[in-house]
């Protein structure tokens, strides 16, 4: 019986050394939905034997205007409660943007209180590596240990900084923010480019996605694909996830509805036939390399020794 090796144990290069993260990052911001998302994570972890998606509790899009402090307190309380019952849960938080008045409160009330229970922090609307560095220091002051940063790139200017951001040692993953990216073009990109099909066809959107993926692979970080706003047509969602994975080089993808999680996980899973093919190819290469090494060793042993005549 042939043993199938995992691709991460076979493939070489920067991405092979990247952190291993669940292939789906599920965002939820409303209190009841946040709780249900964490419950679903626990259920699927028990079902599949490992955690296959992260839950990111959303402050940026989840907090009601004027209720940001109350929302941050609720997020911290939920993290504390759920982590007590499920110590292995993978919970993250998306803060408000650096220039938002609620950013400081988010850091103090969430990272400062339950930072030890978070897997990472998502920073939206990052424009430069200097901003990323500033946020990293702010997190350190609030919590201490070095929490990984996931960075959300959402503008044409930020795309130009993708390689510099990916090179930052605290950055673990970069995500692409499609809707704000399209909006930042002031009408130059049509709304159709945000659709399940158009976002894989429009040249400027494709260029941005590829730039982010290339930056991540260059520095061993995880490229996380943007959300697809398709909830009912699972075939269309699965096709989008396969394109993100197989055409664009992304190894992770956002979801914003529970119905999206399983299709994304399935689409990003390598086919068993592909794993067998790669494993067999690499095993053959290793066998040939070992055979060449043995042959070279035998030749060295058989080489005649130099003789000297003593007069």
Predicted feature residues:
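Expand to "…catalyze enediolate/carbanion chemistry for C-C bond making/breaking, isomerization
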Residues: 1-311
């Amino acid at each position: 019986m042939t043993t199938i090796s995992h691709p991460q144990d076979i493939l070489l290069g920067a991405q092979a050394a990247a952190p291993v993260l669940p292939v789906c990052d599920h965002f939820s911001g409303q209190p009841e939905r946040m709780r249900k998302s964490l419950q679903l994570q626990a259920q699927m972890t028990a079902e599949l034997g490992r955690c296959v998606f992260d839950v990111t509790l959303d402050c940026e899009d989840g907090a009601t205007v004027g209720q940001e402090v109350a929302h941050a307190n609720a997020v911290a309380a939920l993290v504390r409660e759920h982590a007590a019952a499920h110590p292995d849960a993978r919970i993250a938080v998306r803060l408000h943007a650096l220039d938002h008045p609620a950013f400081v409160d988010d850091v103090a009330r969430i990272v400062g209180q339950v930072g030890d229970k978070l897997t990472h922090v998502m920073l939206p609307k990052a424009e430069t590596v200097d901003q990323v560095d500033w946020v990293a220091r702010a997190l350190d002051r609030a919590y201490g240990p070095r929490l990984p940063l996931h960075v959300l790139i959402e503008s044409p200017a930020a795309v130009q900084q993708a390689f510099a951001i990916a090179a930052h040692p605290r950055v673990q993953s970069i995500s692409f923010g499609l809707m704000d990216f399209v909006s930042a073009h002031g009408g130059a990109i049509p709304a159709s480019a945000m659709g399940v099909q158009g976002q894989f066809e429009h040249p400027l959107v494709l260029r941005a996605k590829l730039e982010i993926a290339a930056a991540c692979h260059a520095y061993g970080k995880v490229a996380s694909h943007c959300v697809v706003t398709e909830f009912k047509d699972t075939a269309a969602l699965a096709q989008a996830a396969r394109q993100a994975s197989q055409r664009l080089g992304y190894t992770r993808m956002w979801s914003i509805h529970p119905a999206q999680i399983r299709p994304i996980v399935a689409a990003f899973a390598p086919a068993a036939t592909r794993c067998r093919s790669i494993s067999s190819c690499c095993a053959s290469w290793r066998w040939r390399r070992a055979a060449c090494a043995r042959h070279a060793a035998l030749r060295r042993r058989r080489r005649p020794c130099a003789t000297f005549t003593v007069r």
